[in-house]
UniProtKB/Swiss-Prot annotation:
GO biological process, one term: tRNA modification
Superkingdom: Bacteria
Protein name: tRNA uridine(34) hydroxylase
Biological role: Catalyzes oxygen-dependent 5-hydroxyuridine (ho5U) modification at position 34 in tRNAs.
Any one GO MF annotation of this record: oxidoreductase activity, acting on paired donors, with incorporation or reduction of molecular oxygen
Enzyme class (EC, first level): oxidoreductase
Amino acid sequence: MITNTAAYQFVTIQHPQTLAASVLAQAEQQALKGSVLIAEEGINLFLAGDAEQIGAFYAWLQADARFARMRIKYSESAYQPFARLKVKIKPEIISFRRDDASPLQGRAPSVTPAVLREWLRNGQDDRGRPLVLLDTRNAQEVVYGTFQGALTLPIDTFTELPGALESHRAALADATVVSFCTGGIRCEKAALWMQADGMDNVLQLEGGILGYFEEVGGEGYDGRCFVFDERVALDPELKPLVDAERPAKTGKI
């Protein structure tokens, strides 16, 4: 079996090139595949490989105090969903292009999967306020599944979210808004931006959809969660939609 991981950490990285070289060397040593994005604002990882080698890599990474509290989300597949290993340096570990949404300057309040499940059952939060679940993902992801009744936006990139949300602001004013995404990274920035833009009723779902699946299952969720690899999407039991051996490349005759 292949162990698949998703993890990120917003933390100041003073020398991204140095960290990238070390991460690449360690991941290659453990024969891992996937993608790692590194920026001055942190690190974002999607890695897959043998369970023991995955464990060794993250033990090495979390020995660094900057990443000691990183939350790692796990799932399994029969086959490797990545073709190669890529480690890249980027301006942001998730592109949003908003200076007022830097998790390095603070973090928006969050709600745990268990609490959100209770709110969904009750149709309101603990204070009796109505709920609006805001899907911060792209339209191509949403078609595979989302929370029941979620507000979805017709966007192709995360940077389009502020403009697409503008027409919904009045409807959100009297509700508790819970922003969510695949693993937490986008909803973390989205919630911060919404707060900075004057919305004080916004929370982020801790761990995103995958964290929700992992902790409480699929209650209140319709369908699967899209992922950016050859598994395509995961169901609430974290089982892949596609789990097949990668076809061998063949040359032209």
